[in-house]
Swiss-Prot record:
Residue intervals annotated with topology Mitochondrial matrix: 45-287
A Pfam family: RRM_1
Gene name in the database record: YME2
Residues exposed to the Mitochondrial intermembrane side: 309-850
PANTHER family reported for this sequence: MITOCHONDRIAL ESCAPE PROTEIN 2
Family per record: Belongs to the YME2 family.
Residue span of the annotated presequence: 1-44
Protein name, UniProt field: Mitochondrial escape protein 2
Keyword ATP-binding among UniProt keywords: no
Subcellular location: Mitochondrion inner membrane
CDD domains named in the record: RRM_Yme2p_like
Amino acid sequence: MLLVRTTSLNVSRMPVPCLARGIGILKGKYRLANLMNAQPSVRHVSSEIQQKDQQAGESNTATDTGVIHKSDEETLIYFDNVYARATSVWNPTLWYNLLLRNQSRDAVREKIRNLASPPNNPIYGLELKSTIPVKRDGGVFATFVVPPKYTKAQVNSLIQQNTARESSKNLLSYFTRVSAFPVKGSPWIEDLRRLPSTTIVIKFQGPALTEEEIYSLFRRYGTIIDIFPPTAANNNVAKVRYRSFRGAISAKNCVSGIEIHNTVLHIQYENIIRGHLVSNFFTNHTRIAIPVLFALLSIFAVLVFDPIREFSIEQKITHKYSLSWDNKFWKQLKTLTSSTMTSIKYYWGGPDDNHQRKHLWEERIEKVNDLKMWLEENNNTFVVIRGPRGSGKHDLVMQHTLQNRANVLYLDCDKLIKSRTDPKFLKNAASQLGYFPIFPWIDSVTGVLDLTVQGLTGQKTGLSETKESQFRNMLTTSLMSIRRIALKNYKAFVSTGDGTVNVKEEDYLQQHPEAKPVIVIDRFEGKSEINGFVYKELSDWAAMLVQMNIAHVIFLTETVASNQRLSESLPNQVFKNLILSDASKENSRNYVLSQLEDYLYYNKKSKGENVKEPESEKEIAENNDSDSEADTSVKEAEVILNEKELQEIDASLEPLGGRMLDLQAFVRRVKSGEEPSEALDKMIEQASEQITQMFLSDKIDSNKSAQAWELIELLSANPVIPFREIVNKPLFKAAPETGIMELENNGLITVSRDRGVLQEIRPAKPLYRAAFTYLINDPELAKVLKTRYLLKVVGFETGRIKKWEEELKPLGKVPDQKLFKTRLDYLSGKINASNAVITKCEEEIKNLSK
């Protein structure tokens, strides 16, 4: 009727613009009428493809072909918001919802059935034939068989009403509400990686629709923000932007494939090219972005790895979860077992081995008690134990003082100092501190990155660290772990009879010195050419531990040079010093005889000799004798040995002195079957080889080797050499203190000091004096070493003469020689003295070569 009425207008009377506008209105209204009467079209798939599928016996389901097949008696409804919509290619929300909801096929069908035909308002005869999930879009296509009493339009309307009513009953209906839309087009069921978007792209296969037509067709699915009609460049593509994803998804699935006035609409999601904020930031702001990235990585590494490292350091100190004997449980079990076995041995009269460890230490029991008392004191504990190499500092502390201590951390500076490469140093430091995990290879990577970034941006990232800073970070992390161990049982509030008392951390640590860990730093020398920073870092770290009163610190050192380094770290702290020296002759003899008691008895017994049975521990206790346990063992050994054997042992012990490591080596050799004199000779020979390799070989600097040989000659004749005698020696004149201290640090000699001034020079250990004599008495070796020493002296004196001759040359050209007569006489005397030394050395070399 509308079309008939519009054709009766008097078109001839209209102006041209009005005529054009009128024609446009008529055309738009005519197309709107066609739009209202639009019928769903059929998405055409090549019949040849369908025939091929049928011939092959393959299925033609929507999942396999992308096309939904239905009859005229069926209606197709799209339900949205049934699944979680895919937000990315990986779709993590789908996996999350699988844990919270039952999304099986039967559960989804039951849900669709209850929404479309609920029990309180059913559609009688409605049958759910099939469901096709579109999980990427979060919806489901459902095919229903229309009951005979209803038309398709009535069924669609009832399903929409029931779905809206049923899905709004939930308290969270704003988020879980489901909408149902009849499918007007022919949807394409695809699972391509085309993520849903709020903008849909409409491709017109035929004349394009106007904005009014597009709005009328797509508005029912959601609020439209904007419509982008076809342009002159692309006249068959339009875009519709929705406010929500649900509107765009429903429009795409319900309208795609519809045919309106010979125009088929194909709808897809707009392919969003997302400008990534982070990538754009890195691309456009490189100088800022790269340092920020590395800073974030560093913060992340600290947050993740530092707690693990603190835990591993605590484990290193406490051995709480360790299966070694340092574990507290194993220590208690070992103590219980040892005490039980000791009681059984005592009851049966068996020997007890515990006394054998004490004889050498009888003269040091007082020092052990002092050290234990210092660890139990409430004031800050900073102990320095000094003694020559091999004097038993380590055993005194670790075996006799801290054997039953729970929390002990032992650090060996020698392993750190001797690390030649940075990765090796970091591994050794981490191993001793328990610092795990550590990645030494990162240093090389960060170094390359730092250079690369510096080339790109002109500035360093600061990501690469030196080994000094990394070692300092290890110590800082260790400090936090030590503090946590010390305050493990600390409680801020303590309940008493009068109420609650607030206890400070300082007061708790002052009252419980046993809770503080003990840090033992061994071989602390104070100076080193390689990795010398270790001493400063350790001393500063130890000073901080003592100042915070969270640990006891014990330094083991061989020289007094370390005191200067420690004084710099703790200038106002008074150190507790413990000086260890060699055992006396009597105690050395008692130790060796007590250790050899059982061996001598069973050795003579096996040879068939008649020897007195040693008394058991039980018999010794029952005798109630005034003699000590050590004296008893020594007397038994003296009874077993004859006078000649005792004299042989005494003669062998004379060169060994009281150095504990040498005494232990001597005992092991005798127990292995060597005679005392034979054991001593082999030890002297071994010491001489060690001296030759370290100080007298061809690989050693000739000047140092000559200085060492001169001291060897002097110390073989005299046990002690005053330092003043060395000052005038030719090879020591230039820098006597430097040469002597270098030989001391290398372990050839030891020097006593008086208020820092060098006084007396001795061999590094008593056995070395016998080794010096052995080297001097070896004719072939002594001849080679003596010749090398004399040649060095000749070269030294020759160099001095050349220097004086250079000074004489300009003086000889002066006309009046009387002006410089005094200087000429001085230089002449010097040259004559050096010539005399050279003549004497050459004469000795000549005699040695005969």
